[in-house]
Design a protein with these regions (language model features):
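Acidic carboxylate-rich catalytic motifs and surrounding loops in phosphoryl-/glycosyl-chemistry enzymes
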Residues: 1-6, 147-148
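Alpha-helical recognition segments enriched in aromatics with Gly/Pro capping
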Residues: 10-177
């Protein structure tokens, strides 16, 4: 199985390269990729401001130059693993670059179909596309597919919050015609 921890050194190296090229900047909250207006909107076909309005994921503005900038290398999390590499502050990988590097290393490029929930379009998948281009992975993916989300009266069901429903439960409550 592919493990994110096997890619931490590569994530650190790419973060450092982007920082050295001036494509990224460092704050006390990590290293962020600068995202320019013209680099954005490949999936949604809209500008940065419209992406925020159409995205279903929250974007943390934090200590960034722009709320659209992507975390490449984050600060340590209390109780979490901390990695140390030359040229980077002690910390942890950002998940957008992590996914870009893992998929490009494990799959033949271009990736035929990259799939995820609609909540991943922005900022995650938009960030993956931009990152792939910035690190030299032209023609990263041919097709992007996004499925809808299961919701109840309180919003999106989330496994990470312990909200799980089986098909058996769905069919008990809502039998097929």
């Amino acid at each position: 199985y592919t493990r994110a921890s096997d890619f931490v050194e590569q994530i650190a190296a790419e973060s450092r390269k982007l920082l050295e090229k001036g494509e990224a900047y460092q704050t006390d909250q990590g290293i962020f990729l600068r995202i320019k207006q013209e680099e954005h909107g490949k999936l949604l076909g809209v500008d940065l401001e419209e992406s925020l309005a159409q995205g279903t994921s929250e974007v943390d503005s934090g200590p960034k130059e722009s709320p659209h900038d992507t975390l490449l290398w984050g600060p340590p999390i209390e109780g979490g693993k901390i990695w140390e590499f030359e040229g980077l502050p002690p910390g942890r990988p950002g998940w957008h670059l992590e996914c870009t590097l893992m998929s490009s290393s494990e799959l033949d490029l271009p990736i035929d179909i990259h799939w995820g929930g609609v909540d991943l379009i922005y900022p995650h998948h938009e960030s993956e596309i931009i990152l792939a281009e910035k690190i030299g992975l032209e023609n990263y993916c041919d097709f992007w597919m996004h499925n809808g989300l299961m919701e109840d009266s309180e919003g999106k069901l989330s496994k990470s919050r312990g909200e799980r429903i089986t098909l058996e439960e769905v069919f008990t409550d809502c039998p097929p015609p």
